[in-house]
């Protein structure tokens, strides 16, 4: 039997989640690799799926969980064999396909990455899509020319999963990190992660209305979007760029073209869903090499499947700090 957290939709369109045992025959056949899932995690997108928001889930009943890691049970694909430790994220797993909140899953070989040496399944889910996206953003910004001597790098929404990991990784690479948060009580936490100073959300929302401001940021990892992203664009230095990856502060913004014309700034869209396998492997290897395990452990908390629904709401309410690891067998 397979233990799974299943979300159902009622006749009035409300959704509810419950833990059930299902037969292996009830698991959708989404690919040639069968995985015994050990760990998953909780991201903002998981919170949306658990609560029937964002039009992400197409059909019910549904198993959310956009991340998973475990051991291959069987494989009909070249290059992946029974016993391999693997992780899977992206490609709409947990959204339009059943995801990681179950003890079994399957997927196509091109969605699955064998874990680098020294990275356990639990370690990988302390990172999950959040850590993956943080490293992806840094590599993209550096490919665009960002360097540690090019000025401070702003991380917005720094208390969340992506922001927390990005703060650690940037500081480890020698950047001066300004961490923006709306929660003053986590300032010490962000400083411990490597932030050189704290910027309040209110400060970033206090927009003077000018089309362009003094150049402050050599780069930015923006996890929130909305008018905060518009403000960041005004404050980028010449040739600076912002990696845009979230919309918790809004999906639209009112921005001027002046910084693009006079400073040559860039907005780099970060799509972690459809990254090709070679690049996915590169990102996971970089995470294994650079993210300190002790720091990651300190910023992570483990829960069981029975707590996932509650934490899905908490992450939407901005009440989750750092990373949440889900032990699907717990």
Predicted regions and their residues:
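Glycine-rich phosphate-binding loop and adjacent beta-alpha segment
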Residues: 227-293, 328-329
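Short, glycine/polar-rich helix-capping loops at beta-to-alpha or helix-loop-helix junctions
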Residues: 101, 182-189, 251-257
């Amino acid at each position: 039997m397979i233990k799974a957290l299943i979300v159902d939709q009622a006749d009035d369109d409300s959704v509810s989640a419950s833990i059930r045992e299902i037969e292996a025959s009830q698991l959708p056949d989404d690919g040639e690799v069968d995985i015994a899932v050990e760990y998953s995690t909780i991201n903002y997108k998981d919170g949306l799926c658990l609560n029937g928001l964002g039009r992400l889930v197409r059909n019910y009943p549904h198993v959310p969980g956009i991340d998973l890691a475990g051991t291959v049970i069987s494989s009909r694909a070249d290059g992946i064999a029974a016993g391999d430790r693997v992780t899977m994220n992206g490609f709409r797993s947990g959204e339009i396909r059943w995801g990681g909140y179950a003890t079994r899953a399957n997927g196509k070989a091109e969605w699955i990455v064998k874990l680098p040496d020294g990275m356990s399944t639990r370690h990988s889910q302390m990172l999950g899509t959040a850590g993956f996206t943080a490293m992806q953003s840094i590599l993209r910004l550096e490919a665009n020319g960002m360097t540690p001597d090019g000025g401070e790098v702003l991380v917005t929404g720094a208390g969340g999963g992506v922001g927390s990991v990005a703060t650690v990784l940037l500081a480890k690479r020698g950047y001066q990190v300004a961490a923006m948060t709306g929660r003053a009580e986590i300032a010490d936490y962000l400083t411990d992660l490597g932030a050189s100073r704290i910027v309040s959300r209110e400060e970033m929302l206090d927009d003077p209305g000018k089309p362009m401001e003094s150049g402050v940021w050599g780069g930015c990892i923006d996890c929130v979007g909305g008018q905060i992203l518009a403000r960041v664009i005004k404050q980028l230095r010449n040739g600076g760029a912002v990696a845009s990856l979230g919309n918790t502060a809004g999906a639209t913004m009112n921005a001027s073209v002046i910084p693009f014309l006079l400073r040559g700034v860039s907005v780099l869209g970060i799509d972690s869903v459809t990254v090709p396998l070679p690049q996915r492997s590169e990102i996971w290897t970089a995470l294994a090499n650079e993210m300190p395990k002790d720091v990651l452990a300190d910023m992570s908390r483990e829960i069981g499947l029975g707590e996932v629904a509650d934490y899905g709401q908490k992450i939407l309410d901005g009440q989750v700090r750092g990373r949440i690891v889900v032990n699907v067998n717990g």
